[in-house]
Amino acid sequence: MEQPRKAVVVTGFGPFGEHTVNASWIAVQELEKLGLGDSVDLHVYEIPVEYQTVQRLIPALWEKHSPQLVVHVGVSGMATTVTLEKCGHNKGYKGLDNCRFCPGSQCCVEDGPESIDSIIDMDAVCKRVTTLGLDVSVTISQDAGRYLCDFTYYTSLYQSHGRSAFVHVPPLGKPYNADQLGRALRAIIEEMLDLLEQSEGKINYCHKH
């Protein structure tokens, strides 16, 4: 019997500040060209750097696609590696977005937990991708920056009960080009899907015995 295709949603961000071309969206477009194989329906979206749009769009994406996984990709001017974020944070949002707006509460979800971890083992993903010998360094972080990246990640983790991931990429050419970033994203997401499948297999096995 043919396995049902999995839906995977991957988002990048639009321009903001000095990032007139956002490396995250360029990387996601490269990933779209490469695809994630015949068993995955890949849906990509560019997200504006706007708090209120994020609060509206993230739940809508989960409702529309019922995805196996959502991966958000953002650019960090400080990054020199491709960075896997372990968690999103609820509070501390003071930076203005592209609409010159900032949440009055400075938080994602009032009365929500301080932080939410992804259910994906980012250390395992990092180790597995590193062994593939890609020409891209992959590292781990626990601080997505308290701006739209972190805000988006927390919103998605809250919506999905942890079934989301966030990947920070450096600006284009510092040091990686679009093709390298796209291939790194593909390898990372394939490992994430594999780990999710393994963990679900264990859960199903436990339920049967």
UniProtKB/Swiss-Prot annotation:
It is an enzyme of class 3 (hydrolase). It comes from the Eukaryota. Gene3D superfamilies: Peptidase C15, pyroglutamyl peptidase I-like. Its EC number is 3.4.19.3. Transmembrane segments: none annotated. Monomer. This is Pyroglutamyl-peptidase 1. It comes from Homo sapiens.
